């Protein structure tokens, strides 16, 4: 009873704190003069991290096993892993572009975990026989960490696509406008004003374009590093799961829905990493592949749990009747 009460308190503290954090982020985006509030949001993230950590320790102590046996526990652990990902740029003293992804991702996963949909999983239960193995912590934790990193990297690639799409859209808009000017002889009328500002345009660098270039390069670098880490963790998790499957079911691979989608996910991100080595594919094409991988990883992690089919259906749930 004590552990259950402690877990309930810590869960709601973390959710309340992270709700305040996301509110502060929205305020600082809308009102730039209040940029000093960002320090408060970082303190809130620290409080959230320790609350989630306390919950996981309490659940581990009360259940006697690593808290990754169902969807509720995995979502809480995913929030914890996303915060770890959030702190990586701070350790390296670099610009934290990842926070734009990890902060909302944390509140979404934490919000869903504490919603009424997973009430049946809030109480700790005894592990099913197939999960009573020393491989539980190694395999499931590595897979969960890979999900967290692979959910953090691809959105940065998607941001690159959006920035470049907007640039191309403006380019074609200007090109169409130039055609109209030539057709209706508007270019002669604007010649005087264009000539007068020609010196400024040639001598002063295009700061917005230079900023966009720096931003896309930084996003591309972070996306590549995060996805590379996630791919490594995913590979280790799949290999560990294969060994565990052989012990539990007598076969290394069963083409279970979860295993199939894990293989598809691994293949997509392997193609992404390979595309980075090809000059013609590096950039927009590789970013598109990473964006596709983002959708695939959600199906692999969350979709199979919703369906509740196959050998990996321990984390599935049913809606609680009202």
Curated annotation (Swiss-Prot):
Record keywords: Transferase included? no
Q: What is its main location?
A: plastid
A single GO CC term for this protein reads: chloroplast thylakoid membrane
Q: How does it sit in the membrane?
A: Multi-pass membrane protein
Q: Name one GO biological process term.
A: cytochrome complex assembly
Q: Which GO terms describe its molecular function?
A: heme binding
The UniProt entry, under Pfam families, shows: Cytochrom_C_asm
**Record keywords, A-Z:** Chloroplast, Cytochrome c-type biogenesis, Membrane, Plastid, Thylakoid, Transmembrane, Transmembrane helix
Report the transmembrane regions from the record: 9-29, 44-64, 143-163, 226-246, 259-276, 289-309
Compartments it resides in: Plastid, Chloroplast thylakoid membrane
Q: Which family does it belong to?
A: Belongs to the CcmF/CycK/Ccl1/NrfE/CcsA family.
Subunit-level organization: May interact with Ccs1.
- Cited function: Required during biogenesis of c-type cytochromes (cytochrome c6 and cytochrome f) at the step of heme attachment.
Spell out the protein name for this chain.
Cytochrome c biogenesis protein CcsA
- Supply the source organism's classification: Eukaryota, Viridiplantae, Streptophyta, Embryophyta, Tracheophyta
Q: Which gene encodes it?
A: ccsA
């Amino acid at each position: 009873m004590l552990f259950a009460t402690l877990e309930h308190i810590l869960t709601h503290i973390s959710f309340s704190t992270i709700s305040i954090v996301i509110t502060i982020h929205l305020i600082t985006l809308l009102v730039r003069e209040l940029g000093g509030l960002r320090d408060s949001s970082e303190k809130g993230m620290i409080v959230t991290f320790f609350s989630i950590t306390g919950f996981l320790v309490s659940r581990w102590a009360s259940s006697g096993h690593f808290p990754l046996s169902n969807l509720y526990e995995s979502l809480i652990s995913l929030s914890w892993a996303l915060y770890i990902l959030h702190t990586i740029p701070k350790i390296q003293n670099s610009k934290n572009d990842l926070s734009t992804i990890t902060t909302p991702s944390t509140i979404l996963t934490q919000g869903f975990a504490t919603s009424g949909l997973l009430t049946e999983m809030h109480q700790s239960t005894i592990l099913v026989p197939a999960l009573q193995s020393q491989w539980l912590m190694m395999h499931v934790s590595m897979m969960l960490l890979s999900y967290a990193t692979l959910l953090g990297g691809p959105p940065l690639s998607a941001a690159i696509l959006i920035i470049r799409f907007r640039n191309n859209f403006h380019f074609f808009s200007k090109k169409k406008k130039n055609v109209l000017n030539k057709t209706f002889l508007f270019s002669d009328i604007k010649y005087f004003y264009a000539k007068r500002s020609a010196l400024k345009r040639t001598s002063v660098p295009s700061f917005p374009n230079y900023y966009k270039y720096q931003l896309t390069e930084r996003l591309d670098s972070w996306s590549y590093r995060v996805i590379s880490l996630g791919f490594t963790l995913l590979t280790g998790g799949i290999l560990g799961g294969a060994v565990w499957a052989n012990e539990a079911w007598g076969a290394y691979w069963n083409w279970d829905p979860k295993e199939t989608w894990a293989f598809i996910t691994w293949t997509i991100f392997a193609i992404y990493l390979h595309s980075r080595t090809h000059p013609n594919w590096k950039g927009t094409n590789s970013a598109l592949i990473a964006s596709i991988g983002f959708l695939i990883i959600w199906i692999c992690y969350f979709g199979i749990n919703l369906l509740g089919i196959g050998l990996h259906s321990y984390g599935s749930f049913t809606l609680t009747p009202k």
